[in-house]
């Protein structure tokens, strides 16, 4: 899977700013789940 760090976010399951299954991980929004 491709991991693309995006806008910074706060851990806790923030929706970030995507309608796709992005997850907040290590302070960044990544695709799907944290590796």
Swiss-Prot record:
Coiled coil: none
Disulfide bonds: 9-25, 16-29, 24-34
Superkingdom per UniProt: Eukaryota
Record field: transmembrane: none
GO cellular component: extracellular region
Cell compartment(s), UniProt: Secreted
Main location: secreted
Keywords associated with the record: Cleavage on pair of basic residues, Disulfide bond, Ion channel impairing toxin, Knottin, Neurotoxin, Secreted, Toxin
Keyword rRNA-binding: no
Propeptide residue interval(s): 1-8
Expression (tissue specificity): Expressed by the venom duct.
Record GO terms (molecular function): ion channel regulator activity; toxin activity
Stated role: Probable neurotoxin with unknown target. Possibly targets ion channels.
Family: Belongs to the conotoxin O1 superfamily.
Domain notes: The presence of a 'disulfide through disulfide knot' structurally defines this protein as a knottin. The cysteine framework is VI/VII (C-C-CC-C-C).
Name under which the protein is recorded: Conotoxin Cal6.1f
Organism: Californiconus californicus (California cone)
């Amino acid at each position: 899977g491709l991991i693309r760090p995006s806008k910074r976010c706060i851990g806790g399951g923030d929706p970030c700013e995507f309608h796709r299954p992005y997850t907040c991980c290590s302070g960044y929004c990544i695709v799907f789940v944290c590796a």
